[in-house]
Amino acid sequence: QVPLYQEDCSYRIHMPVNFRSRLSADCVAYCAETLPRFHVFLEDTYYFSESGLTAIEEMALGFVEIRHLIRQLLGRGIDVDSFAPRIAILLNCSMDFFEEIAKIRATRRLFARMMRDEFGAKDPRSHSVVITSHTSGLAMTAQQPVNNIMRGTLQSLSLVLAGVQAIEISAFDEALRTPSRESHLVSLRTQQIIDLESGAAQVADPL
C-alpha cells in the first residue's frame, strides 16, 4: 500500500514517495500536538476521479492513502484520537446524481468502521469525517457553456442531499478559459439559491 500523494494527475511534485509520505506524517503529528482545532489532513481524491477512475476506485485509493498515513502515525506512538477527529476528505462530484450521493454516504460509513474497528478509536468524533467536494471540471463542456450552469446545479444538489460540509462548484466557462468573475459569481449564487431558496438544506438526511 504505497501512497500516491498527488502523483496521479497534474500535480508535479518530484519528491521520493517515502519522503513525501514522511513529510505528511510530520505535519499531521505537529498539528495534532500544537494546533488542536486545525484540520490536520485533507485526503484529496478529486484528481483520481478527474483522471478517469470510477467512484469506487476514487474511494478505494483515498482510503489506501488514509490508512497508510494513520499507520505511520500509530507507529510513532501517536494516539489515534489526537488527530482522527480532524481528518477531512475532498471528493470529486460527477454527473451521476445518485451514485455520487451513495459514494459520499458510503465514505462516511466506511470511515467510521475503519476508525472504530481497525484503528480502535474511542472518541466518537474520530468516527466522523469532514467531507468537502469540488464538482467535476471534466463535466463542463466547451460547447454551449451556459448549460454548464445546470450541470453544476445538479452536482451541487446531489452534494447537499448527501450531506457534505462544503461545496465548490466548477465555473461554467472552465472548459474555455481561466474562469471569469461572472462565472465565479454564478457558482456562488448557485450555492446560495440551493441553500436559501430551495429548502433542501433545511432537511436532515432527506434520502
Where are these regions (language model features)?
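Catalytic alpha/beta active-site cores
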Residues: 1-94, 99, 118-121, 125-132, ...
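Anaerobic metallocofactor- and corrinoid-dependent redox/one-carbon enzyme cores
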Residues: 48, 133-138, 150-152, 168-171, ...
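Short glycine/threonine-rich loop-to-helix capping motif typified by GTGT followed
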Residues: 52-60, 94-106, 135-149, 177-186
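A generic secondary-structure signal for well-formed alpha-helical elements
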Residues: 70, 115, 194-198
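Conserved, mostly hydrophobic/aromatic
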Residues: 111, 162, 190
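Outer-membrane beta-barrel translocator/pore domains, especially the C-terminal barrels
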Residues: 114-116, 123, 141
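Short beta-strand elements
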Residues: 154-159, 192
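Active-site or pore-adjacent capping/gating segments
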Residues: 165-207
